[in-house]
């Protein structure tokens, strides 16, 4: 074999799929699978079989194209080790950096409020329905749970991060196991309700409106945007020097594609399994009760008449416990991002960016009081979680995940090669439809 053949063979071997690529595929997948997934079956199943089938068709394109667009933006910076904030500042100046800081903070903070409401409702449902105790005061329950989490965060942050990383895979395995375990309880109610003669495309409960609102919950549930910047930096440092930026972009796209396929397979199977076990009417009731689908499933099995099997009893309690663990995991993960973002905003605008004027401990205390205080107020008010996702959480995520990369592709010279593509139109439409939910909710 010649020297040139040896070099080509070596480069091919080095550039093939690596263990680190598998690790990142699973990492992106694990980041997206959180408490938001527990609300997707409710919105997806709310309109019956046909809307959820249409969402199944849209799920992978939404997950893949939107995250690939964000990854391309992160890849466009001149510094291989630069994160998304540095890249946006490079393209749009300091103002762009401030905008991205605000977007990151306001994309994550409402999620904490959502999880505050969710964990309060889930705990109270478990307390009353599974444990059979008398109802507790809502304000007290919310305060107790938030103080408990604040205590864990304040005194055990490092331990918390380790526990979170260990909980990702048991939670995903639990979702798959529950999806499979529900198969014996599947029924034809959702199919029997399909009446092609009375189907409506428009109107409040029409297919188009249901799918439109479903897009928001898909953007929310199929979201690993918080980790995309770190992922791209890691891949650029690993591949770009030896194989170039174009190869790195293709590798990132390949990893995002595989992560998206895994994510869609698990979440959609879970959603279909829940829908075939329950019914669209049950999903509407779960939305009205403002609880995640696992809590509703637990109550559903608790209300079964006749002799319940050991499996049904186990599933009743396991569903609630898994829901609580999932929400705790998601809350802790998003708290760290919110804390970092709020600390940055306070430092930038309160202390003019001078880190010597304030200690990290003081910053953390100020931020924690605001975060936990605002979360308690929202948890006590108990707004509808799906409405909160559709009106706040998803639109802000869409502005970061969909519209910011599309604007950058249009304006930044280093992204000019991606202009004029159909997938750009798709990502833009998804972003605009998600943001327009705010208008729909107002009227």
From Swiss-Prot:
InterPro entries: Amino_acid_transport_2, Hydroxy_aa_transpt, Thr/Ser_transpt_TdcC. It is a multi-pass membrane protein. The keyword Membrane applies. It catalyses: L-threonine(in) + H(+)(in) = L-threonine(out) + H(+)(out); L-serine(in) + H(+)(in) = L-serine(out) + H(+)(out). The chain crosses the membrane at residues 22-42, 44-64, 97-117, 140-160, 163-183, 207-227, 261-281, 311-331, 366-386, 389-409, 423-443. Belongs to the amino acid/polyamine transporter 2 family. SdaC/TdcC subfamily. This is Threonine/serine transporter TdcC. The lineage of its organism: Bacteria, Pseudomonadati, Pseudomonadota, Gammaproteobacteria, Enterobacterales.
């Amino acid at each position: 074999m010649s020297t040139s053949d040896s070099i080509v063979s070596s480069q091919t071997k080095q550039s093939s799929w690596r263990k680190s690529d598998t690790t990142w595929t699973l990492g992106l997948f694990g980041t997206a699978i959180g408490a938001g997934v527990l609300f997707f079956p409710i919105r997806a199943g709310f309109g019956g079989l046909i809307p959820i089938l249409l969402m199944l068709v849209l799920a992978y394109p939404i997950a893949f194209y939107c995250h690939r667009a964000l990854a391309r933006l992160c890849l466009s910076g001149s510094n291989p080790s630069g994160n998304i904030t540095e890249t946006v500042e490079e393209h749009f100046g300091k103002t762009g950096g401030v905008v991205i800081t605000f977007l990151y903070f306001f994309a994550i903070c409402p999620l904490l409020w959502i999880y505050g409401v969710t964990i309060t409702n889930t705990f109270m449902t478990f307390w009353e329905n599974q444990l059979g105790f008398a109802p507790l005061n809502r304000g007290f329950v919310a305060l107790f749970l938030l103080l408990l989490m604040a205590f864990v965060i304040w005194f055990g942050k490092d331990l918390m991060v380790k526990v979170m990383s260990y909980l990702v895979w048991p939670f995903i395995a639990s979702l798959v196991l529950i999806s499979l375990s529900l198969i014996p309880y599947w029924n034809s109610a959702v199919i029997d309700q399909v009446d092609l003669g009375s189907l409506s495309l428009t109107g409040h409960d029409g297919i188009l409106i249901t799918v439109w609102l479903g897009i928001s919950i898909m953007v929310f549930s199929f979201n690993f945007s918080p980790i995309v910047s770190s992922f791209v930096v890691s891949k650029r440092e690993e591949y770009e020097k030896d194989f170039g930026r174009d190869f790195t972009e293709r590798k990132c796209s390949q990893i995002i594609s595989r992560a998206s396929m895994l994510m869609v397979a698990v979440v959609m199977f879970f959603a279909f399994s829940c829908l075939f076990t329950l019914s669209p009417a049950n999903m509407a009731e779960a939305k009205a009760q403002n609880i995640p689908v696992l809590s509703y499933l637990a109550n559903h099995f608790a209300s079964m008449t006749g002799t319940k099997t050991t499996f049904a009893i186990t599933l009743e309690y396991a569903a609630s416990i898994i829901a609580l663990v999932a929400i705790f995991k998601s809350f802790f993960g998003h708290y760290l991002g919110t804390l970092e973002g709020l600390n940055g905003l306070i430092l930038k605008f309160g202390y003019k960016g001078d880190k010597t004027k304030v200690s990290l401990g003081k910053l953390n205390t100020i931020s924690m009081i605001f975060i936990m205080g605002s979360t308690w107020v929202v948890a006590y008010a108990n707004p509808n979680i799906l409405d909160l996702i559709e009106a706040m959480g998803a639109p802000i995520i869409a502005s970061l995940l969909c519209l910011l990369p599309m604007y950058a592709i249009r304006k930044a010279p280093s992204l000019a090669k991606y202009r004029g593509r159909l997938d750009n139109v798709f990502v833009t439409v998804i972003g605009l439809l998600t943001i327009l939910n705010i208008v729909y909710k107002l009227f």
